[in-house]
């Protein structure tokens, strides 16, 4: 590169390509695996790693006290994510494994498995092809801090650790009524989850060691070990209360497992705000611009600026404004392209609102090479929109704007001279809102990773939701 031609500017296509294909994350993952496994032939190792394409498979650890429901949640997660459930029981029952046979004999005599043996069983299972391809969910493993450290030393690092918690009194009550279906392995309860089928009821069995005294002993042992395990997973740990319906626990666990952790990859926000008029797009765009320095791009404002500048594009726009007609998409995209390709948008990122309004415009924006990496739909009921807009008034003398409910005029004299913008009439608002929602379904389907935000709340609460959606990685879709 010629040093005399500085300053050098990276073409905008390069970071866009890296972001689209997750180049940074891919290189980071390969480097991690190289340092963990230290292969003699790094090139062949990296090629096989790329062919495996398993960076995003679930690697989850679920911990919790007896009767917390961790096995049920783990089974549901496995079915939903098409992953492999790994428990101490199925590790001991594996066929064609000498290690499992030895561990089972030891367990039958001493009622426990040595730490090193259990970790070796875990390593053996996780290195099998189905676990490499589809990921794994460890149920109740590790049981002790020593096991957690040994697993980490082997480079078997989970991406998400879920810890279920509930009061001991609740857990004891649950455990006493626990029943197991020997055919399917499903867990039922005499009070909370009794099967309706008589056939299943008749074959249920009561597991050993679920009396109140036995459960209290197990809880005591669990509490003694869990406080030493948790510091091993400081940044990937989430505690979920299991003293709630099982479906709610599962939903929280699934949401966490599908979420990604923050990455060090370079990220330039390109935000699109969609919503009906009066939903607060302009305010949210201004707040994002103020806090993060994003370039605030209002499509309508851009068209007015182009017309005021008396440019060639402005001459094309002016007749449509004078006749109050919709500006053609071809002209709008030319104005947008001129703005989005400027250096401040490339360096700082941007927040766009007012375009696209329908599916064709969304496809047009994407074909221009300016697809957003965060899309938010602000949903507000029509009643709230009417309340926000129809009560707006302007003082023609001072230019000050009022709202008859939230910011009333100070005197009767001022109130008497207030005027309403024709665009704030109820008929016009209903027409525009109906037009937006007629096209919003196609837009939401096109931007299938968009985030839906309830815009009918305090604007700073809405901003916090949008901010969270920008800062945190988008949740992964289950295929």
Swiss-Prot record:
CDD domains to which the protein is assigned, alphabetical: ADK, DD_AK8
InterPro entries recorded: Adenylat/UMP-CMP_kin, ADK_active_lid_dom_sf, P-loop_NTPase
Annotated AMP 1 binding sites: 140-143, 147, 203
GO CC annotation: 9+2 motile cilium; axoneme; cytoplasm; cytosol; sperm flagellum
Protein family per UniProt: Belongs to the adenylate kinase family.
Main function: Nucleoside monophosphate (NMP) kinase that catalyzes the reversible transfer of the terminal phosphate group between nucleoside triphosphates and monophosphates. Has highest activity toward AMP, and weaker activity toward dAMP, CMP and dCMP. Also displays broad nucleoside diphosphate kinase activity.
Record protein name field: Adenylate kinase 8
